[in-house]
Amino acid sequence: MLPSQEASKLYHEHYMRNSRAIGVLWAIFTICFAIINVVVFIQPYWVGDSVSTPKPGYFGLFHYCVGSGLAGRELTCRGSFTDFSTIPSSAFKAAAFFVLLSMVLILGCITCFSLFFFCNTATVYKICAWMQLLAALCLVLGCMIFPDGWDAETIRDMCGAKTGKYSLGDCSVRWAYILAIIGILNALILSFLAFVLGNRQTDLLQEELKPENKDFVGSTVSSVLRPGGDVSGWGVLPCPVAHSQGP
């Protein structure tokens, strides 16, 4: 084996070990993002009360709990994703739909992990990358649309008269909203990493095929050519030479 070929083989083996380790980390963080997505969809802690709010309570994408404003802290909870009429704002309905779509996409991406056993690795990485990118986009839309519903009457009663679209008044952003934003960054990084891994796998496959093709061509040529220089299966045709005749 030539020194260049040996160096290429060592590089390939080193890269494959690192690629597997990075792929495992990518899969683990993809599962973490799926958990984040499920949590932010279910939990009603996107926005909530503060010390100066007229009423206690908190809101999520579709479920919310609001108190009476009296001395007691008892909350009345309403809202269900299966019954859109109980969601206080059309913006909340749209945001809930996009976050749900993001959750479905990332769960579908995890399901695609099984394709690594049957399909080309580069293809699976690229499929997952597109699904993660779409999941991030849906989560971005959900986070952007959600504040458009802050002018709903139910939220204004809890957060005060200063509350309006993209203005929370006396209320504050809670941890689920912040977690959703972190999930967006996570999904974008995972998508970029999956594209890199997929493209690198494609490049390695092409590099592996090049020497195989060269060996195949070389063996074919050597088997076709005879030791005498004749081509097997082809007769050497005599070349007609024009003889000039004397006068």
Curated annotation (Swiss-Prot):
Protein family per UniProt: Belongs to the LHFP family.
GO biological process terms held by the UniProt record: gamma-aminobutyric acid receptor clustering; neurotransmitter receptor localization to postsynaptic specialization membrane; regulation of inhibitory synapse assembly; sensory perception of sound
Protein name from the UniProt record: LHFPL tetraspan subfamily member 4 protein
UniProt keyword terms in alphabetical order: Cell membrane, Cell projection, Membrane, Postsynaptic cell membrane, Synapse, Transmembrane, Transmembrane helix
Major location (coarse): other
Location(s) in or outside the cell: Cell projection, Dendrite; Postsynaptic cell membrane
Organism: Homo sapiens
Membrane topology according to the record: Multi-pass membrane protein
Stated role: Plays a role in the regulation of inhibitory synapse formation and function by being involved in maintening gamma-aminobutyric acid receptors (GABAARs) clustering and their associated scaffold proteins at inhibitory synaptic sites. Acts in concert with NLGN2 to recruit or stabilize GABAARs.
Subunit and interaction comment: Interacts with GABA(A) receptor subunits. Identified in a complex of 720 kDa composed of LHFPL4, NLGN2, GABRA1, GABRB2, GABRG2 and GABRB3. Interacts with GABRB3. Interacts with GABRA2. Interacts with GABRG2. Interacts with GABRA1. Interacts with NLGN2; leading to mutual regulation of protein level and synaptic clustering.
TM annotation in the entry: 22-42, 97-117, 127-147, 178-198
Molecular-function GO term, any one: GABA receptor binding
Highest taxon in the source lineage: Eukaryota
GO CC terms, sorted: dendrite; GABA-ergic synapse; inhibitory synapse; plasma membrane; postsynaptic membrane; postsynaptic specialization
